[in-house]
From Swiss-Prot:
GO terms for biological process: fatty acid biosynthetic process; lipid A biosynthetic process. Its EC number is 4.2.1.59. Keywords: Cytoplasm, Lipid A biosynthesis, Lipid biosynthesis, Lipid metabolism, Lyase. The active site is at H58. This is 3-hydroxyacyl-[acyl-carrier-protein] dehydratase FabZ. One of its GO terms (molecular function) is (3R)-hydroxyacyl-[acyl-carrier-protein] dehydratase activity. It catalyses: a (3R)-hydroxyacyl-[ACP] = a (2E)-enoyl-[ACP] + H2O. GO terms for cellular component: cytoplasm; membrane. It comes from the Bacteria. It is found in: Cytoplasm. Involved in unsaturated fatty acids biosynthesis. Catalyzes the dehydration of short chain beta-hydroxyacyl-ACPs and long chain saturated and unsaturated beta-hydroxyacyl-ACPs.
């Protein structure tokens, strides 16, 4: 049953995120949710450290966090927003659902992200109908836009 969960808490820590998102190391790219308004917007972040495995090859002696992983982090954040907007914070329902990418549009990378950065994802709902959600927004470091994208996803049953 689809319903709106307007009274959700606005902050979620890693132990909460792990109960909703199925991603795990090394692909969980959200450390904390710092603002959430159901059916509207979300702000989350990932701390970028030199210890990320990806820096072994991207690039030696010039570590830059890959743009595709920035977009994936935005998608995970949008998936958290969509799921909790529909079902609230419900780990039992989360075990039965999965969010799939459908489209990635209007992606632009503006500034490289490097170790030591706090990568913030700022997303808002552009539209949704049933299990199909479209979100758009930016990734930021120190208030500067480092990337932007529009993403469409669907929530499906896990098999």
């Amino acid at each position: 049953m689809e319903q709106s969960h307007q009274n959700l808490q606005s902050q979620f820590f890693i132990e909460h995120i792990l109960q909703i998102l199925p991603h795990r190391y090394p692909m969980l790219l959200v450390d904390r949710i710092i603002e959430l308004q159901a059916n509207q917007k979300i702000v989350a972040y990932k701390n970028i450290t030199f210890n990320e495995d990806v820096f072994n090859g991207h690039f030696p002696n010039k570590p830059i966090f890959p743009g595709v992983l920035i977009v994936e982090g935005m998608a995970q954040t949008g998936g958290f927003l969509a799921f909790t907007s529909l079902w609230g914070f419900d780990p039992e329902i989360a075990k039965t659902k999965i969010v799939y990418f459908m489209t990635i549009d209007k992606v632009k990378f503006r500034i490289p992200v490097t170790p030591g950065d706090r990568l913030e994802y700022h997303l808002e709902v552009l539209k949704h109908k049933g299990m199909i959600w479209q979100v758009g927004g930016t990734a930021q470091v120190d208030g500067k836009v480092v990337a932007e994208a529009e993403l469409k996803a669907m929530i499906a049953e896990r098999e």
